Design a protein with these regions (language model features):
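Fe-S-dependent hydro-lyases/dehydratases of central metabolism
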Residues: 1-646
Length: 646
């Protein structure tokens, strides 16, 4: 996207990849949508994005010798690890910005996804301008090498790249997008770069960052090392690893896997000799792509193994076995560790790494936060659309875990099995979090389960799941939502949700409700030692509470009962289910199963007319053009959704 100029300074670019944040490294507002959104975008040429609160992140001071951009983002994720930037947009500022190369900015922006942010944007500055000028020179070289056109970029009829041109760049840098004077931010986070040391994330969490000297003392042996995927496999990353490993050999018993970020990058690394240096040292070559980072292909971690990777995620089970340990680090540390057979860093002249954590500060801007809270607390009453359940109810399960990620909900190894059934999804749901979860769900015999003999009931009754904060963080895989639905869960209650997961849920008829007070009460009563992230008091990862819970769609009342129809334990208040969410729920539950997925796109195409018409009044009529289009796509329209014919 960046190589081809689709992601460009001063524009907004969306893609169905959770790491679209990476485009922020070139001053582009890159943010993730999900695959249903992408399909709808192709059909309608429109998408939606709710503008989030903005956090100002100051990177101040000079980087010490041996410290890289990857160390910065590992430190940010590991020190500001209390959801400070969850579902926010980030603007990077500070005196440390000019010393960061564009490749380092791309790595940092890439992992703002793991940090919990929706966007991570760097300024459009002289460093970026010089980088683009070098890209234009590379295009000229490729044009010369390929006889008049740059392979993969230029058409045979033109010698000019359709997007990366000197004229377009001149306009961007002549009129850069800058913050408004007096711009207000939700908060300001500051990282003192001078206090930073090479850092390692993990094991199995990006929210745990350890200075490298500490792990070196711990003598952590490794079995596998990875320089793959989108975060740190650009030409400069490959060169950094090659400079560490050149003339050496990968340690006996260690497998070192490499894959370039793209075919263009691999050609560049081959031409420089850096690729050959890695291969000569014993590295195993994989094709460009996600590969081990998402748990696909060869080289995955096996039971009891330890791996270190230059990728962006090390969630439990993501890179192989849930019984393995995965760490994240810079390309230099990964290469040095591959040679040493344990986690170590390279010897860097003048480097004086410390075992102390970095210096940070947080400033909350109360006026902005208060305005956001006031806006959020303004309840808007929504009418109940025909066929939308007025009440969601069922027995309550509790997973006492914060940051329960999409790999935990739906393992990556199943993600690209396009023929997998809903029944199979139900069998593997939450597998990397709790292998017993699917069995528990089967025992509860939810009427909303895909294997229900008469088909899944869409009347709001099922098993309701509660969990901690930042639920669904991680990838954009849609199956994290559909697997929960398939298992018989129509609604999830959490302290907060990852935004990408929430989009997937809305598109697929899984209702998400934020109820922090309920989560704190359940944590006190059922979590081990009254704290999340260590399972329940009974030693189980998933707690079968004794409660029956009800969530009202219109009044937003959450009622906790001792049993179905029993005495009320406590009541909570949340927001009502919005009209747009109801529409999407109806489309996913009634349109898609009867008429097919193409019909959902038509349903979405006419969402504006439906929104004007959704008050349920029989005197209102659906616009004739919308009715004709909908009838053409919905042969069984009356069965699809009575909403359309009322």
């Amino acid at each position: 996207m960046i190589e081809e100029g689709y992601a460009f300074p001063g524009v907004m670019t969306v893609a169905s990849d959770s790491h679209s944040n990476m485009y922020g490294g070139v001053g582009c507002v890159g943010t993730a949508i999900v695959r249903t959104d992408a399909a709808a975008l192709w059909a309608t040429q429109r998408t939606w994005w709710q503008v989030p609160p903005i956090v100002k992140v100051n990177l101040e001071g000079n980087l010490p010798a041996g410290v890289t951009g990857k160390d910065i983002i590992i430190a940010l994720c590991g020190t500001f690890n209390k959801d400070e930037v969850l579902n926010h947009a980030i603007e990077f500022h500070g005196t440390g910005i000019p010393q960061l190369s564009v490749d380092e900015r791309l790595a940092i922006a890439n992992m703002t996804t793991e940090w919990g942010a929706l966007v991570g944007v760097f300024p459009t500055d002289d460093v970026l301008q010089k980088w683009y000028e070098s890209q234009l020179k590379k295009l000229e070289l490729r044009k010369f090498q390929f006889g008049g056109s740059a392979a993969g970029s230029l058409s045979s009829s033109s010698s000019q790249h359709p997007r990366l041109t000197a004229e377009r760049l001149e306009q961007v840098f002549k009129n850069p997008v800058l913050p408004d004077e007096g711009a207000q931010y939700a908060k300001t986070l500051t990282l003192d770069l001078t206090s930073l040391s090479p850092s390692v994330a993990g094991p199995n969490s990006v929210k745990v960052a350890t200075p490298l000297p500490v792990l070196e003392k711990d003598d952590v042996k490794i079995n596998k090392a990875y320089l793959v995927s989108c975060t740190n496999s650009r030409a400069s990353d490959i060169k950094a690893a090659a400079d560490v490993i050149r003339g050496k050999k990968v340690a006996p018993g260690v497998e070192f896997y490499i894959a370039a970020a793209s075919s263009v990058v691999q050609k560049e690394a081959e031409a420089s000799g850096d690729w050959a240096a890695l291969v000569s040292a014993g590295a195993k070559v994989l094709p460009a792509g996600c590969g081990p980072c998402i748990g696909l292909g060869v080289g995955l971690l096996e039971d009891g193994e330890v791996g270190i990777s230059a990728t962006n995620r090390n969630y439990k089970g993501r890179m192989g076995s849930p019984n393995a340990l995965a760490y994240l680090a810079s390309p230099e540390v990964v290469a040095a560790s591959a040679v040493a057979g344990k986690i170590v860093g390279p010897k860097v002249p003048g480097a004086k790494p410390s075992s102390e954590g970095p210096k940070i500060s947080i400033e909350e801007h109360k006026s902005t936060a208060a305005a956001a809270d006031s806006s959020a607390s303004t309840a808007v009453s929504e009418p109940l659309l025909p066929n939308f359940p007025p009440l969601f109810s069922g027995p309550l399960l509790f997973a006492p875990q914060d940051n329960l990620n999409t790999d935990g909900i739906y393992p990556g190894k199943y993600t690209y099995q396009d023929d997998i059934t809903r029944e199979k999804q139900a069998d593997v749901v939450m597998e990397n979090y709790d292998p017993e979860f699917a069995t528990i769900m089967k025992s509860l015999e939810s009427p909303a389960r895909s294997t229900n003999p008469s088909g899944p009931q869409r009347n709001g009754e099922g098993v309701l799941l509660a969990s901690g904060y930042n639920f669904g963080t991680g990838s954009s895989r849609e199956q994290a939502a559909t697997a929960l639905l398939s298992s018989g869960i129509p609604l999830v209650l959490c302290g907060s949700f990852g935004d990408i997961f929430k989009r997937n849920s809305i598109n697929n008829a899984l209702i998400c409700v934020e109820c922090p007070e309920l989560i704190e009460d359940l944590t006190r009563d059922f979590a081990a030692e009254g704290k999340r992230n260590a399972g329940g008091k009974d030693g189980k990862l998933t707690v079968r509470t004794p409660y029956w819970i009800e969530v009202g769609s219109v009044d937003g009342k959450v009622t906790l009962r001792k049993e179905k129809g029993g005495d009320v334990v406590k009541e909570y208040r949340v927001g009502a289910v919005g009209g747009s969410v109801q529409e999407m729920w109806l489309g996913a539950c009634f349109v898609a199963p009867v008429c097919g997925p193409d019909s959902v796109l038509t349903f979405q195409r006419h969402s504006a007319q439906l929104a004007d018409w959704k008050d349920g009044s029989r005197s209102a009529s659906l616009p004739e053009n919308a009715r004709r289009d909908l009838e053409a796509h919905f042969p069984a329209i009356s069965a699809c959704s009575p909403l359309l014919y009322l």
